A protein has these predicted regions:
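Residues forming the Rossmann-fold NAD(P)(H) cofactor-binding site
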Residues: 1
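Glycine-rich flavin
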Residues: 5-12, 17-89
Length: 89
């Protein structure tokens, strides 16, 4: 996608083909969703250490997975919109 945008910026004609949602595997089901989940796991791990520094109330944190999934999917959808907007330029 980056190469296509650069070529278009240099005046070349470009055709981009996407058989699914714009952004490809990385944005939609690979790198991005995985990193969002990894970040959440890191946050939960960090929160489990807060009590060692005198922060109370972080014991027994529970993940509301449907709410998390909704937020993760909204983030991916936002990226799809950014890609669509960039292509339209």
């Amino acid at each position: 996608m980056g190469a296509g945008r650069r070529a278009a910026a240099l005046g070349k004609k470009v055709a981009m083909i996407e058989n699914r949602v714009i952004g490809g595997t990385c944005v939609n089901v690979g790198c991005v969703p995985k990193k969002v989940m990894l970040n959440l796991a890191s946050y939960l791990e960090e929160a489990s250490l807060f009590k060692d520094y005198g922060v109370n109330g972080t014991e027994g944190l529970k993940l509301d997975f449907p709410a998390f999934k909704e937020r993760r999917d909204a983030y991916v959808k936002r990226l799809n919109g950014i890609y669509s907007n960039n292509i339209a330029k």
